[in-house]
């Protein structure tokens, strides 16, 4: 049976948050697209720090300029504005801000606030309607997710020689003038992704290694000089089915109460199916376990089953529900919340 037009559109939207960005200018080799979304959302939970309105707006632009037939300049900026705060509160944050150059088959090089190399793997399981992707990927946590001071080189199809083999090389400069858990020393990262020449199956791997700061080594937990991580992932995306799994390990990197975990073992898996009429149910599992932590030994940092669904009215409008079934023990020695959360809401995106 032929897929409906709606199903094809939805699969495109899921594949890229900005796939249907609005083109506002395209002339003489210069192009500018804008994109964004309004997520009107409410959390229901016994955890008072989570329960309540979670509405926010995201907005961004992507631009490029054709310098010559080989060289293209580009830039991207994205911000988020909280919709659940008083007007007097400062609630804006910059998610992405980078610019760079792309030289045809030789790849692209950019600098700024960007996604870390480890997230090239972790993104495959960060697909739940609301939750997910939080075992090892955290904002401003070395190169696990969005971070500042990143110089990033990306190459697709390995210089045009191997279809489907993509490579990332990344360097992160020192960031110290912030909370110790958000700091980082100089570091590097790399990732490889291969889809076997355009098949529906792909594998990926990533590695990062960074210096830790003096302030981080003064914290009670994890005093190693280096923060290190590796990750590997598998993905299948075809026939309306999406399946992905990720395993990673971090050392002296994952934040916990009192500092960082000496070691964390992280696992995520997600399964989704796209119905022709717009419904996309989702089932997943996320776990992060801290190992050999000072004073407490091994303890779960994140552990939950996720059951959710998104209904796409069209490419711009959707409604969702996401149930985070927490598996953390009530007597968790790190004080991690053990309460369930249900997220319900609607999203308008362009």
Swiss-Prot record:
KW Electron transport (keyword) present: no
GO biological process: monoatomic ion transmembrane transport
A GO term for molecular function: porin activity
Topological category with respect to the lipid bilayer: Multi-pass membrane protein
Cellular compartment(s): Cell outer membrane
Entry-linked Pfam families: Porin_1 (PF00267)
Alphabetical list of InterPro entries matching this protein: Gram-neg_bact_OMP (IPR050298), Gram_neg_porin_domain (IPR033900), Porin_dom_sf (IPR023614), Porin_gammaproteobac (IPR001897), Porin_Gram-ve (IPR001702), Porin_Gram-ve_CS (IPR013793)
Protein origin, superkingdom: Bacteria
Keyword set, alphabetical order: Cell outer membrane, Ion transport, Membrane, Porin, Signal, Stress response, Transmembrane, Transmembrane beta strand, Transport
Keyword Nucleotide-binding: no
Induction, per UniProt: By phosphate starvation.
Residues in the signal sequence: 1-21
Residues spanning the membrane: none
One GO cellular component term noted in the UniProt record for this chain: cell outer membrane
Similarity annotation: Belongs to the Gram-negative porin family.
Reported function: Uptake of inorganic phosphate, phosphorylated compounds, and some other negatively charged solutes.
Subunit structure: Homotrimer.
Name the UniProt record assigns to this protein: Outer membrane porin PhoE
Organism encoding this protein: Enterobacter cloacae
High-level lineage: Bacteria, Pseudomonadati, Pseudomonadota, Gammaproteobacteria, Enterobacterales
Gene name per UniProt: phoE
């Amino acid at each position: 049976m032929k897929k409906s037009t709606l199903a094809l559109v939805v699969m495109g939207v899921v594949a890229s948050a900005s796939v249907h960005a609005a083109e506002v200018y395209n002339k003489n080799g210069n192009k500018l697209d804008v994109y964004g979304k309004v997520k009107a959302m409410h959390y229901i939970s016994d955890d008072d720090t989570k329960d309540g309105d979670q509405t926010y707006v995201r907005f961004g632009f992507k631009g490029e300029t054709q310098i010559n037939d080989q060289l293209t300049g580009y830039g991207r900026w994205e911000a988020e504005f909280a919709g659940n705060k008083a007007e007097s509160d400062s609630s804006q944050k910059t998610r992405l801000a980078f610019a760079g150059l792309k030289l045809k088959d030789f790849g692209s090089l950019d600098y700024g606030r960007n996604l870390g190399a480890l997230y090239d793997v972790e993104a495959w399981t960060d697909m739940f309607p609301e939750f997910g992707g939080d075992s090892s990927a955290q904002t401003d946590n070395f190169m696990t997710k969005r971070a500042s001071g990143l110089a990033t080189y990306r190459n697709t199809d390995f210089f045009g020689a191997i279809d489907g083999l993509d490579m990332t090389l990344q360097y992160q400069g020192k960031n110290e003038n912030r909370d110790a858990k958000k700091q980082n020393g100089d570091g590097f990262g790399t990732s490889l992704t291969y889809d076997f020449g355009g098949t529906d199956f792909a594998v990926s791997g990533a590695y990062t290694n960074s210096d830790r700061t003096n302030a981080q080594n003064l914290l009670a937990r994890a005093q190693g000089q280096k923060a290190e991580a590796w990750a590997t992932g598998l993905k299948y995306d075809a026939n309306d089915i999406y399946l992905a799994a990720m395993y990673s390990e971090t050392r002296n990197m994952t934040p916990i109460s009192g500092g960082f975990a000496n070691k964390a073992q992280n696992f995520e898996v997600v399964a989704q199916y796209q119905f022709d009429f717009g419904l996309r149910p989702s089932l997943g599992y996320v776990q992060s376990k801290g190992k050999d932590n000072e004073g407490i030994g091994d303890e779960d940092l994140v552990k939950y089953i996720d059951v959710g669904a998104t209904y796409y009215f069209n490419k711009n409008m959707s409604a969702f529900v996401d149930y985070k079934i927490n598996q953390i023990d009530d007597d968790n020695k790190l004080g991690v919340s053990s309460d369930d959360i249900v997220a319900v809401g609607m999203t308008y995106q362009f």
